[in-house]
Design a protein with these regions (language model features):
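Sec-dependent bacterial lipoprotein signal peptides
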Residues: 1-20
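Secreted, cysteine-rich disulfide-bonded mini-domains of extracellular proteins
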Residues: 22-128
Length: 128
């Protein structure tokens, strides 16, 4: 293969790698809601996210009183521990675990207490 052919091949490979890196993420992915963490510095502190005390950690916010307190693609959930958290919303389990390892998978569940009502939604619930 001549040099020009190699350049074309490398250009195609670079384009393919860039396209695969873009993903199908939503606002919650971009903001890190639901991501696994071990400390607050791994969460989006500009958006007041903290590493919540769940198994594997969970980047989110606590103390919300309504969905508007949470970033887009997340909702205010009254957890069984009595605290309100902003958890990412989901359609299926895969959406919950893009940024979590298999040992700390979250579940996409409709069996949570949405502060403003479920309205057919589900949320990514981290393991306890």
């Amino acid at each position: 293969m001549d040099q020009r052919g190699r350049q074309k091949q490398l250009a195609c490979l670079a384009a393919l790698l860039l396209a695969s890196a873009c993903g199908d993420g939503n606002a919650a992915d971009e903001r890190g809601i639901g991501a696994q963490c071990t400390g607050n510095d791994q969460c989006n502190v500009d958006l007041q996210q903290v590493c919540l005390p769940f198994k594997g950690g969970y980047c989110g916010e606590m103390g919300c009183t309504k969905d508007a307190d949470c970033v887009p693609d997340s909702a205010c959930i009254r957890h069984t521990d009595g605290v309100n958290y902003c958890f990412r919303t989901c359609a299926d389990k895969a959406e919950c675990n893009a940024n979590r390892d298999p040992a700390n998978e979250a579940n996409c569940s409709s069996s949570v207490d949405f502060v403003e009502g479920a309205m057919g939604r589900k949320a990514c619930v981290p393991p306890s």
